[in-house]
């Protein structure tokens, strides 16, 4: 019976994606499934997918990260400023990754070493990064429109390679296995000799790397850096992971599939609701209600990453 339940749970995200796509195809018609809109869906889901894949290890050990959108914005701003000063396009990817990894490392160290709840430490990082971006930009923008945005070939290659890397980490390495074990039972993990602090911090480094790469592609796609960059990304990532089947309590529910399927579901849902004429304010209400319902059925109350671990 337990095996049947587990198999059904694994199938639900895929079935949900098919249902959501079918419903909006019927309601929106060619406006929804036209080539132009499908390309828009892929572009919108790319950042969520990439970041979602990266932070999967954080959620695997029962953590949570509310700072991803703000860290993405800060990384893009610093990279755009560095490019304007140096004039070397290659500096963009270097700076976005270094800035994002540094921010995530700080969040990880504060969470793990100071025993600050991850929701609090990541919110502090969010406020700090947003404050820096707003203070520096002062509602101005930094344009990099002279640089060509990568086509879907390179972007897809990066996504596939990164998804494969995260899959290998989760399935075959100590980093993935130990983070999932920590999410299942942190006390048992410590008792078995796992260096809990080290592997949790490594998870934040992986997440930071993903945010940095996503920031690079996002900056080139938009062609401009503004204070609006990254707003709402954290909730889209969390909702995507949960809709994809990952439990916020962590553990062995953490999979690559969660990030990919969940990202497509949340973006298709948002896009479809807009196409059929649902006001933006109501879309937020719908997303919030769905997120709450899924959370109620997936997390274990005593293990949600709201308390010091």
PLM-predicted stretches and their roles:
Residues 86-127, 161, 261-262:
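Alpha-helical transmembrane segments within multi-pass membrane transporters and channels
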Residues 1-23, 164, 184-198, 271-309:
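Cytosolic-side transmembrane-helix boundaries in multi-pass membrane proteins
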Residues 5, 114-175, 201-202, 221-230, ...:
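Transmembrane helix-bundle core of multi-pass membrane transporters
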Residues 19-28, 34-85, 114, 241-253:
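Single transmembrane alpha-helix segments in multi-pass membrane proteins
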Residues 10-15, 41, 49, 70-71, ...:
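Hydrophobic alpha-helical transmembrane segments
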Residues 211, 226-285:
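Transmembrane alpha-helical segments in multi-pass inner-membrane proteins
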Residues 88-96, 102-107, 151-226:
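Helix-loop-helix "hairpin" substructures at the membrane interface of multi-pass membrane proteins
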Residues 13-25, 55, 126, 130-131, ...:
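Hydrophobic core segments of alpha-helical transmembrane domains in multi-pass membrane transport
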């Amino acid at each position: 019976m337990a095996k049947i339940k587990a198999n059904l749970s694994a199938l639900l995200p895929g079935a949900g994606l098919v249902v959501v796509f079918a419903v909006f195809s019927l309601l929106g018609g060619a406006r929804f499934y036209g080539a132009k809109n499908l390309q828009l869906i892929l572009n919108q889901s790319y950042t969520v997918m990439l970041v979602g894949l990266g932070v999967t290890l954080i959620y695997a050990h029962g953590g949570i990260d509310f700072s991803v959108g703000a860290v993405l914005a800060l990384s893009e701003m610093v990279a755009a400023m560095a490019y304007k000063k140096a004039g070397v396009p290659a500096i963009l990817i270097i700076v976005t990754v270094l800035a994002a990894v540094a921010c995530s490392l700080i969040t990880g160290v504060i969470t793990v070493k100071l025993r600050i709840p991850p929701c609090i430490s990541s919110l502090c990082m969010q406020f700090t990064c947003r404050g820096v971006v707003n203070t520096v930009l002062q509602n101005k923008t930094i344009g990099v429109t002279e640089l060509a945005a990568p086509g879907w070939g390179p972007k897809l290659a990066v996504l596939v390679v990164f998804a494969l890397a995260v899959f290998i980490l989760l399935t075959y390495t100590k980093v993935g296995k130990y983070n999932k074990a920590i999410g299942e039972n942190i006390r048992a993990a410590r008792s078995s000799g796992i260096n809990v602090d080290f592997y949790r911090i490594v998870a934040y480094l992986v997440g930071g790397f993903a945010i940095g790469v996503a920031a690079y592609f996002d900056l080139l796609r938009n062609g401009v850096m503004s204070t609006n960059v990254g707003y709402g990304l954290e909730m889209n990532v969390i909702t995507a992971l949960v809709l994809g089947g990952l439990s916020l309590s962590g553990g062995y529910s953490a999979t690559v599939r969660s990030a990919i399927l969940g990202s497509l579901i949340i973006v298709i849902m948002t896009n479809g609701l807009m196409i059929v004429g649902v006001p933006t304010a109501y879309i937020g209400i719908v997303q919030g209600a769905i997120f709450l319902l899924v959370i109620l059925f997936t997390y274990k109350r005593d293990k949600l990453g709201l308390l010091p671990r």
